[in-house]
Each structure stands twice: as structure tokens, then as C-alpha cells.
């Protein structure tokens, strides 16, 4: 495999609205991010994935873009953006822009003109259909945010298509003029000096509406190859696609270098395992064996013909320590264990802001405290269909996107040092105990565990390129594996439970003196025939 710079990089995702507010309007901004670059340098990351900061009416917190080449005033200006890129570059950090090209805002000039003039060149930039015989929607396709994916436009006497909110009309990727406009815009950003793109719901751009195909349409991969050739293909940029329905087979189509599409994709098979019947509002406990089967499958099947992205959480998902670990008694131990589990795998790790200090889910008491459009839409859809308020709030507490979007905890001052104004969303009340200032003062904190994991990846090519060999595949409580190349042999052992686990080690690991590279509890220097892992214990040793 040809080595690329992003193979041994670690990416840190920033959700700007909730990261750091420099002007005290309650909304995080670009100058706030600039003020924290030294913190990120201390952590050791070398890429920032920046959630959208483009001009937007913020119906979906910036994932509804009204101008791709302007910065939303609440985040700052293009001068601030250039300053961020320059100061990040001085610290060896690249900026990956979050790009949404499946849809735009309904306030984008393209859509405004398409709506106002049926003869406009922009009319066919979007998907319009006549009503059915009785005025009904053209099909029963549903919006990902709940309800129908069709919105009636009274003035035009037609429906337009929106897979997300009605204020996020889908672009018509069957129109070559759309390709050209999007590719020109992408090249403009590349010329500004960005390090790559995270492509939002990119598996939807090949949709075939009249066949009711939304994801993974036949045109998807030819479109991505066209995008690659026209924009980032020869620029050595990191590109990662959000692909909710990806399998290892389709992930190879996206990320095999020979196909000239993307660097890697985000797959969500390990995420949806914790949804009952695929419904995120019906959470279910972690089945570790099922989870391991998914992770092992992805590690083995992409080992030579693609590249994995490694992540636990992001701006759309609940906090990792609350979902997969224990956010109470064993918060610190389980957060470190989960970090080790992920960062020793083969692929590019992603850290979501606050993950490195063990931030937890929030359980707001009232629906009114939630700001997320998906949460509010689905609350109405579900309760209208008979789901009780109590049941729905339980699902919201577990899986609302706002779990990830409460402000970053910088210290124990008012509003956690995020702002001196009134924050756009309430804080998690545990910020006095869980914050950056506390973490930096404690050499045994979760933060320094992440710092060490990042350093280990940089120092040990076996973590980046070595073979992945599963251990104890059927053990219901332990996720263990080996990483091996011609020079090094690592063993990674992780207890996912609050009970001690006794392992009978295989013969090739028995009676060995070992070097402990990282542990969340006491280090191990000798492997006998048996090993006891205490609750949430995690060990990485080198033979």
C-alpha cells in the first residue's frame, strides 16, 4: 500500500457553534477556535475537521448552506477563516472543510431563482415534480428528519424534493451544470489552502428519485470519480465521505486508491447496532460480540484494498463514554479503555471535541431545552403516532444529536469558559468536574491518555500499517487483538464491563516478558498463562 500523510494522522472534529465563543454572543466562532490552537497542539492532533461555517440561515445548524464561498457572520469572516488556516498551518495542522453538496439551503440564490422563475437555468438544479392525480405527493419517499420528502410550492404548483428539512432542497446531480458549479466551488476552497473535505451524506448524490433509490444509486461512483478528477484527485488531500449504508464491499469502491474516489468513508454499522430495529429513538444495550464482529469484519476486509476511518462519536452521535462505557463510577477508566480500543486499530482515528476529556451525554429535563431540528421533528412524528412522552424522552436522552452539541467545557467558571454571554444551548451541568483545566492539571487524566495514544501512533508504524489479528473473538466482555508487522508485535486487551474478567492466554502469548506501551490502570510487564482484567481495564503490550 502506498503510504499517505493521512494514514498516521489523527483528526479532531470541531463543531464551531459549541467550541469557544470569542465575542460573547453565546455562539462559538472562528476566533474562538484560533484561541485554542495551542491546546490542540498539546493534544497532538494534526488535522481539524471543521463542521460547516458557511453562510446559512441555520435551519440545520449550518448543514443548510446559502453561500458556499462566504462565512456565516456569527462565526466570523473570510479573513478569520484565512487566519485560522494560516495559524493552524504554522502548527502543522491541516483544516478539512465539511462540505454539503447533496442539498443547499432554500435561501441559496440558486434555489431562490429556481423557485421564482421556471425558465431559469437554475430550475433544473433542483428536483421538481408535478402532484399526483389528487394533489398528493409524487411518491411516498420520506425525509430523514421525519415526514414526507416532498414540499408543495404553491406559487409553482409543483413539489420539490428534500431528503432532510423542507428548507434543505436536494440538488439535482443528474444535471451536469450542477457538477460544474460544485466543482468550481471546491477548487476555490482548495486554492485557499485547505487540507481536504469531509463530504456530508455523499452516498445520496446518485439518487434516482423516480425509482425510489436514494442511497448508493448507480451514478454515485461515476460521480465521485468525476469529482475526484475535477477537483482534489491530484492534490494529496484527505477526503472522507459520510456513507450511512456502506458495507466493507462498497467502502472498498470508495477508498481503494486505484479507483480514484475518496481517501476513506465513515461507516455506521457499529453505531446502528445500538438501535432497536434500526430506530435511533429506541436505544438498546451494547452486544459486545455483535460489535466485535462488525469491527473485525471492517478491519480485515479493508486491510489491503481501502482505508478505515475510526470513530466513536461526532456532532450527530451520543458521547462515547455514555454509549459504550460507564459515565458514572468508571467514567475515567472506561473513557481511556474506549480510546485505546479505537486508536490501536488500523485506520485514521477521529476525536470529537470533548471526547478527550470524557464529556458525557446530557439529559435535559424538558423538550424545550433541545435545539436539534431532527430531535424536535421526530418528537412530533413519534408522539403523534402514539409513542409516549416518557418513552420519547428516554430515546432523546440516549441518542439526540444535542448530546454532542452542548458547549465545550474549558474550566469551572460560569458557562464553563465557553462564553461570558448566554450560550445558544444549555451546558451539561457536570462541567465543574469535567473540564479542560482539570484535565490539564492531572497527569493521569483522559486528556493525557489521548495524547499518549496519538504519540504512539506517530512512533510505531505497526499501529498504522501492521496486520490486525483478532483475539478472544467469542468472549462476551473483552475486545482483544494483535497488531503485527516484520518488526513489532503488539497485544491489545480491553475489558468492556464493570466486572473482572479472567483470560486464558493462547500459547504464543504465554510466559512472555513484555513492555507495557499504555494502560489505564496498573501496567503489565509479564504475561503468564492467565490474565485478570479488572473493570474497564485496558492494556497494550509489546512482545
Please provide the spans of the model-predicted regions:
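Acidic/aromatic-lined carbohydrate-recognition and catalytic surfaces
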Residues: 2-183, 187, 191, 202-257, ...
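Loop/helix patches that line or flank the sugar-binding groove of alpha-linked glycan CAZymes
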Residues: 6, 231, 238, 245, ...
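Beta-sheet entry/capping signal
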Residues: 47, 92-94, 186, 195-198, ...
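Flexible loop/turn segments at secondary-structure boundaries
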Residues: 56-57, 103-105, 204-209, 246-251, ...
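Extended, hydrophobic alpha-helical segments in both membrane/secreted and soluble proteins
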Residues: 197-201, 338
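Active-site clefts of carbohydrate-active enzymes
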Residues: 209, 307-327
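Beta-strand-rich binding/interaction modules
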Residues: 500-520
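C-terminal beta-strand-rich structural cap/linker in extracellular carbohydrate-active enzymes
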Residues: 527-543
Amino acid at each position: 500500500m502506498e503510504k499517505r500523510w493521512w494514514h498516521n494522522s489523527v483528526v479532531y472534529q470541531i463543531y464551531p457553534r459549541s467550541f469557544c465563543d470569542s465575542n460573547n454572543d453565546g455562539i462559538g466562532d472562528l476566533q474562538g477556535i484560533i484561541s485554542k490552537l495551542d491546546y490542540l497542539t498539546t493534544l497532538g492532533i494534526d488535522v481539524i475537521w471543521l463542521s460547516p461555517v458557511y453562510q446559512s440561515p441555520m435551519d440545520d445548524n449550518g448543514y443548510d448552506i446559502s453561500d458556499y464561498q462566504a462565512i456565516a457572520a456569527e462565526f466570523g469572516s473570510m479573513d478569520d477563516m484565512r487566519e485560522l488556516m494560516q495559524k493552524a498551518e504554522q502548527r502543522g495542522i491541516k483544516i478539512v472543510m465539511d462540505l454539503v453538496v447533496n442539498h443547499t439551503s432554500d435561501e441559496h440564490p440558486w434555489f431562490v431563482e429556481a423557485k421564482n422563475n421556471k425558465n431559469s437555468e437554475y430550475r433544473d438544479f433542483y428536483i421538481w415534480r408535478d402532484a399526483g392525480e389528487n394533489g398528493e405527493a409524487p411518491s411516498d419517499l420520506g425525509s430523514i428528519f421525519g415526514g414526507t420528502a416532498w414540499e408543495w410550492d404553491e406559487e409553482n404548483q409543483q413539489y420539490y424534493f428534500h431528503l432532510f428539512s423542507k428548507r434543505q432542497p436536494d440538488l439535482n446531480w443528474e444535471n451536469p451544470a450542477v457538477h460544474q458549479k460544485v466543482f468550481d466551488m471546491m477548487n476555490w476552497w482548495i486554492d485557499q489552502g485547505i487540507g481536504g473535505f469531509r463530504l456530508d451524506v455523499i452516498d445520496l448524490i446518485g439518487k434516482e428519485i423516480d425509482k425510489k433509490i436514494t442511497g448508493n444509486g448507480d451514478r454515485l461512483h461515476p460521480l465521485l470519480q468525476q469529482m475526484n478528477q475535477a477537483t482534489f484527485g491530484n492534490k494529496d488531500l484527505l477526503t472522507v465521505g459520510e456513507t450511512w449504508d456502506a458495507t466493507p464491499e462498497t467502502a472498498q469502491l470508495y477508498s481503494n486508491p486505484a479507483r480514484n474516489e475518496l481517501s476513506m468513508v465513515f461507516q455506521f454499522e457499529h453505531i446502528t447496532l445500538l438501535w432497536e430495529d434500526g430506530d435511533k429513538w429506541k436505544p438498546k444495550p451494547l452486544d459486545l460480540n455483535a460489535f466485535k464482529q462488525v469491527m473485525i469484519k471492517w478491519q480485515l476486509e479493508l486491510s489491503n484494498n481501502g482505508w478505515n476511518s475510526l470513530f466513536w462519536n461526532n456532532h450527530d452521535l451520543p458521547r462515547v463514554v455514555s454509549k459504550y462505557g460507564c459515565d458514572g463510577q468508571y467514567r475515567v477508566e472506561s473513557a481511556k479503555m474506549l480510546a485505546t480500543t479505537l486508536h490501536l486499530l488500523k485506520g485514521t482515528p477521529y476525536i470529537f471535541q470533548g471526547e478527550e476529556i470524557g464529556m458525557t451525554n446530557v439529559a435535559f429535563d424538558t423538550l424545550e431545552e433541545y435545539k436539534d431540528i431532527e430531535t424536535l421533528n421526530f418528537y412530533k412524528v413519534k408522539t403523534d403516532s402514539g409513542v409516549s412522552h416518557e418513552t420519547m424522552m428516554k430515546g432523546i436522552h440516549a441518542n439526540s444529536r444535542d448530546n454532542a452539541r452542548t458547549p465545550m467545557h474549558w474550566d469551572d467558571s460560569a458557562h464553563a469558559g465557553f462564553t461570558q454571554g448566554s450560550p445558544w444551548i444549555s451546558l451539561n451541568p457536570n462541567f465543574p468536574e469535567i473540564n479542560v483545566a482539570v484535565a490539564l492539571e492531572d497527569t493521569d487524566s483522559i486528556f493525557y491518555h489521548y495524547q499518549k495514544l496519538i504519540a504512539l501512533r506517530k512512533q510505531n508504524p505497526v499501529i498504522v500499517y501492521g496486520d490486525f489479528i483478532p483475539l478472544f473473538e467469542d468472549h462476551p466482555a473483552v475486545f482483544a487483538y494483535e497488531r503485527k508487522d516484520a518488526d513489532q508485535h503488539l497485544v491489545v486487551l480491553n475489558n468492556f464491563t464493570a466486572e473482572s474478567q479472567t483470560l486464558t492466554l493462547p500459547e504464543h502469548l504465554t510466559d512472555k516478558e513484555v513492555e507495557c506501551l499504555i494502560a489505564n490502570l496498573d501496567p503489565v510487564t509479564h504475561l503468564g498463562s492467565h490474565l485478570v482484567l479488572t473493570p474497564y481495564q485496558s492494556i497494550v503490550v509489546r512482545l
